[in-house]
């Protein structure tokens, strides 16, 4: 079982590397790590397990956060209508994104960042993702709102980008007009 001790923190070089694509068939280790990542997210959202194991609540995690610079991630997040998006995605790519932008009212956080970083992180409000499941089956997935923000945050990790790289340095509280605000 993964715990917070397995997650690397900001400053670790894996968080700034561009991760390499996985090849199929996946190794048993890659499959297990993907499943363990999803299990971590599920456990972190369970109040009792989170307290017992000292887990910070998370809705997404990427392999580089575990010092594995390969292109896969897990998300376990509900949208505004309580629909669950629970996936382990290998080699995810953003196929298309909306012009409409969105952000979280309280900014973003990250399991690899142990401090609060104030500021808006403006992202696309909708994205379409091409990816593969652990068996190499191609997937085309659409996300909007909060789940779209989460998936973009995790894909950024695969490209060596941290959420705070998107914050306006001169004015972190600047919010461009017509941005949808969630949360």
From Swiss-Prot:
Gene Ontology biological process terms in this record: co-translational protein modification; translation
Protein's UniProt keywords contain Iron: yes
GO molecular function annotation: metal ion binding; peptide deformylase activity
InterPro entries in the cross-refs: Peptide_deformylase (IPR023635), Peptide_deformylase_sf (IPR036821)
Active site residues according to the UniProt entry: 154
Cofactor note as given: Binds 1 Fe(2+) ion.
Reactions that this protein is recorded to catalyse: N-terminal N-formyl-L-methionyl-[peptide] + H2O = N-terminal L-methionyl-[peptide] + formate
Positions with a binding annotation for Fe cation: 110, 153, 157
Cofactor needs: Fe(2+)
Enzyme class: hydrolase
Keywords: Hydrolase, Iron, Metal-binding, Protein biosynthesis
Enzyme Commission number(s) from the entry: 3.5.1.88
Gene3D superfamilies: Peptide deformylase (3.90.45.10)
Homology family: Belongs to the polypeptide deformylase family.
Function noted in UniProt: Removes the formyl group from the N-terminal Met of newly synthesized proteins. Requires at least a dipeptide for an efficient rate of reaction. N-terminal L-methionine is a prerequisite for activity but the enzyme has broad specificity at other positions.
NCBIfam families: pept_deformyl (TIGR00079)
PANTHER family given in the database record: PEPTIDE DEFORMYLASE (PTHR10458), PEPTIDE DEFORMYLASE 2 (PTHR10458:SF8)
Protein name (database record): Peptide deformylase
Lineage, top ranks: Bacteria, Bacillati, Bacillota, Bacilli, Bacillales
Gene name in the database record: def
């Amino acid at each position: 079982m993964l715990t917070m001790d397995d997650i690397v923190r900001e400053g670790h070089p894996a968080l700034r590397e561009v991760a390499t694509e996985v090849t199929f068939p996946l190794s048993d280790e890659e499959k297990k790590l993907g499943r363990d990542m999803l299990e971590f997210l599920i456990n972190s959202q369970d109040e009792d397990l989170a307290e017992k194991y000292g887990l910070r609540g998370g809705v997404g995690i990427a392999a580089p956060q575990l010092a594995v610079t390969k292109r896969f991630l897990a998300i376990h997040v509900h949208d505004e209508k309580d629909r669950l998006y629970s996936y382990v995605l290998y080699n995810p790519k953003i196929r298309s994104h909306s012009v409409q932008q969105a952000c979280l009212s309280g900014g973003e956080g990250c399991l690899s960042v142990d401090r609060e970083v104030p500021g808006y992180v403006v992202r696309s409000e909708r994205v379409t993702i091409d990816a593969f499941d652990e068996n190499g089956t191609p997937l085309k997935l659409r996300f909007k709102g909060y789940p779209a923000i989460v998936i973009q945050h995790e894909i950024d990790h695969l490209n060596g980008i941290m959420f705070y790289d998107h914050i306006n340095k001169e004015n972190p509280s600047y919010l461009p007009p017509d941005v949808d605000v969630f949360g």
